[in-house]
């Protein structure tokens, strides 16, 4: 559903890359990659991937993917500095995708259009799962709700970012939070994002970053 909706081609992801090439992702800029020497390369250091943000963009260029098309892959990573809980572990098995856009597409309205297409694919998947397993009942709302991290802070000023997310999701069922990574009115970020490739400063039509 998702690969068809977004016009994505499957590619195989690396488990590790050579250190110093700038391919491995820095995540929030402080996480340490797992490294090991490769004997037949003169003990050159390799790094287990953190994520594939940079690699995916190199792959798009290598395959000369046209705007409106992209790639998806199954990433296996180790994150030694991950804060462990019931949702996060040292080992990451994550489906990842990236698509080519034009300079003119770098707008909040385009972002929200892509999110709606992704959510539509999720709804179709939910429908198919419920058809295949009648004991399941659909629970997702028909539409996804968009909200800026600053508006979320204004709504729930006494809650932590995670508690705000829980509260807004209980209210709307499916939510996309914008502006993550930039400082809010309380001087804090909603959450950490990569300074290398994440964009939290594109101006929306309503004037918000």
Residue ranges and their predicted role:
Residues 1-209:
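Structured aminoacyl-transfer and RNA-binding surfaces used for tRNA recognition/handling
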């Amino acid at each position: 559903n998702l690969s068809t909706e977004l016009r994505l081609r499957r590619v195989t992801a690396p488990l590790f890359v050579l250190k110093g090439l700038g391919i491995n992702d820095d995540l929030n800029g402080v996480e340490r990659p797992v490294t090991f020497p490769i004997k037949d390369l003169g003990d050159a250091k390799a790094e287990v991937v953190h994520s594939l943000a940079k690699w995916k963009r190199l792959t798009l260029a290598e395959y000369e993917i046209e705007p409106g098309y992209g790639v998806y892959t199954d990433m296996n990573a180790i994150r030694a500095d991950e804060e462990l809980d019931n949702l996060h572990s040292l080992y990451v098995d994550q489906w990842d995708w990236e698509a080519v856009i034009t300079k003119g597409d770098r707008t909040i309205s385009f972002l929200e259009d892509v999110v709606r297409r992704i959510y539509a694919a999720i709804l179709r998947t939910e429908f198919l799962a419920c058809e295949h397993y009648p004991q399941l009942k659909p629970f997702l709302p028909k539409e996804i709700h968009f909200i800026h991290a600053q508006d979320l802070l204004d709504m729930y000023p006494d809650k932590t970012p995670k508690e705000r997310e829980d509260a807004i999701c209980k209210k709307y069922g499916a939510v996309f939070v914008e502006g993550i990574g930039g400082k809010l009115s309380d001087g804090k970020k909603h959450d950490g994002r990569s300074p290398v490739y994440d964009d939290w400063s594109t101006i929306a039509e309503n004037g918000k970053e």
